[in-house]
């Protein structure tokens, strides 16, 4: 929670081999190099997919990255049992993903209580106003708004703007999906996002830029560095 609750914009940078919207993203998947480069770039949190069917993730990949970096880590999976929360803690996760579309308010509150007992933070993902209300009622402290339409995979940042006022000021507001440029980050910052979740790399690139961590002292420089990542990956498509 503290990793993304700080002045300015926080960055949650993702390590994943595939996604439902893009298929296989990285045939050559140097996940340890990617994670280390995110850490060197000053990422506030590293997100790692462990879901095997749609994202081609694994618990072993998460564990290897956990052993290689000290940056806080988010385990992203379809969490549907409290067993997975205990498992995540044993794997070294600092945060887990809870998806409102999969959990009613009662179940979400129960899972959040288990997270509190285990010392885990939880990113509660929402897509619409009803899901945000459920997240708030359950006591979520980190609320993500996914700007991707899960029916056609299009991205609409106006969704983040429409829903912003429903998120309590004391909660961390994370904008998810489709962030492709510093202009996107600036737009999300202007509507009050506290953090962005960026699902790079989005090509089969085997190398990642490693900017100097000292460059990340302020938000403008931080966004410029992230734009370097985007430019390089776009050139390789």
Segments predicted by a language model, with ranges:
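Conserved, mostly hydrophobic/aromatic
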Residues: 13, 38, 46, 88, ...
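Glycine-rich phosphate-binding active-site loops on the catalytic face of alpha/beta enzymes
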Residues: 87-107, 144-153, 191-232
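Catalytic cores of alpha/beta
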Residues: 80-92, 127-138, 175, 179-198
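Alpha-helix-loop-beta-strand connector modules within alpha/beta enzyme cores
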Residues: 1-9, 55-78, 100-101, 107-125, ...
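Active-site mouth loops of central-metabolism enzymes
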Residues: 12-30, 71-80, 121-126, 174-179
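Glycine-enriched alpha-helix->loop->beta-strand junction motifs that scaffold or abut catalytic
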Residues: 42-43, 68-71, 90-96, 116-120, ...
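Active-site beta-loop-alpha junctions enriched in small/polar residues
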Residues: 16-18, 51, 78, 101, ...
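Glycine-rich active-site/cofactor-binding loop and its immediate structural neighborhood
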Residues: 19-76
């Amino acid at each position: 929670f503290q990793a993304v609750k700080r002045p300015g914009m926080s960055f949650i940078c993702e390590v994943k081999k595939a996604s439902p919207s893009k298929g296989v993203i990285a045939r050559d998947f140097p996940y340890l190099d990617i994670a280390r480069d995110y850490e060197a770039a000053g990422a506030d949190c590293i997100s790692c997919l462990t879901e095997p069917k749609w994202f081609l993730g694994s618990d072993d990949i998460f564990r290897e990255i956990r052993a290689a970096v000290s940056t806080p880590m988010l385990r992203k999976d379809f969490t549907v049992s409290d067993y997975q929360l205990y498992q995540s803690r044993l794997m070294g996760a600092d945060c887990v993903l809870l998806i409102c579309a999969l959990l009613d308010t009662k179940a979400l509150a129960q899972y959040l209580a288990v997270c509190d007992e285990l010392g885990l933070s939880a990113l509660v993902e929402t897509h619409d106003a009803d899901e945000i209300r459920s997240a708030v009622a359950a006591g979520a402290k980190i609320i993500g708004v996914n700007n991707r339409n899960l029916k056609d995979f299009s991205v609409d940042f106006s969704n983040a703007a429409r829903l912003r006022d429903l998120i309590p000021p004391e909660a961390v507001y994370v904008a998810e999906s489709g962030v492709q440029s510093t202009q996107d980050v600036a737009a999300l910052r202007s509507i009050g996002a506290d953090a962005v979740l960026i699902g790079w790399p989005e090509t089969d690139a085997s190398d990642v830029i490693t900017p100097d961590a000292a460059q990340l002292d302020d938000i403008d420089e931080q966004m410029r560095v992230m734009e370097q990542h985007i430019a390089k990956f776009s050139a390789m498509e």
